[in-house]
């Protein structure tokens, strides 16, 4: 038993910080000669280094356990992820009570960089020598933060909470009864999240030559490659909480908000207040990643040149919902001035929806998923003659994946017998009450509206390659050229292959809407209307 003006139950925090760095410098020299008198020598100097820092905060929650009863009495009770467990009754009396979640956090930052320099030479006959030098550099940096919610809980045979202002992100479980009385109450989701960012590059340059000392000649070669990448993203995921018991009663004099909160009753689930709002949990994802790579090479042993490039972009921007449930044998949601349900499901035998003098609104939460993945690549090769480059081979690819989905987390209330009463208007937008028997009175208008669930997903893949030297025939040679193309399967001397794949998924379905009953005796005193989904 605790009796005080202020009661604070906080967590024990464990903070860790680690730091590491490394620097390595390597020199490699090798030489070889084989039985055919081929000789090669190579030397490379490479340096690389990096650092990584990791910091974390973990919470160990306060645990209060009793074989029989737990009693906490104070003006203000602050519970940070507190874990209560009682064999009989857990009783809380206060003017305000906060049951909040905390978060375990991990933050990582890393950086790495390196550079290399190498030279090589080889010959097979000591008449011609291939010599080369290469230099390279790379840099990568990344940062990430991860947060995982830690919820509090109350577990007992009976849970009684009497307070003025009540805020909860905790799980409340009773084998018998949960009874919460408050002036106002806010139940809300906890959230786990992740952010990440980073980028880097890698560059390599190589120059070489085939040298013939006796002829006083050298044919140069160049090899260049460059790549870069970057990413930036964040996401959050709802961690819902649950109020569970044989009987669950939550009553407020003011507004009762349940967001990201489930109510599970074996027998009776009763939710009441001046105004009652029950809504789904919220999730979001926002990511951007891009990469680019290119390369150029000019060969030495033959007069040739090549080029390649690749680009990739990935983006996502999604807003979705985690639906919540209010279940019991008998479910009653009652307010003096309005009931709003969004993204809620319910299964019961008896359902009572009473908005008092206010409006009754059953709506669906809109989920949007937007993803775009694009990958493009090109590769060309050809010969150089008379200061002119003529492509003789090449390939390319294009891959595009696009997702544009808009669906809904519906409000769906399934029961055997339902009573629906509202002193104002009633609307069922992408939402429905499904029952055998429905009765009640709607003093204002009643409007039902179907919403469209749209799924649009397209995947396109194109790959092409070709080889040969473009040869436009003269007027007197066209017949011979056409014959050669026919025999070789080419066009103007160029062979080409292409493969195209397209996969598309386009679906549109309607949500349920309105009151669907075998016997519907609801009296609508205003205008009753319905909007069907249009294809």
Model-derived features: positions:
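Binding/recognition "hotspot" determinant
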Residues: 1-535
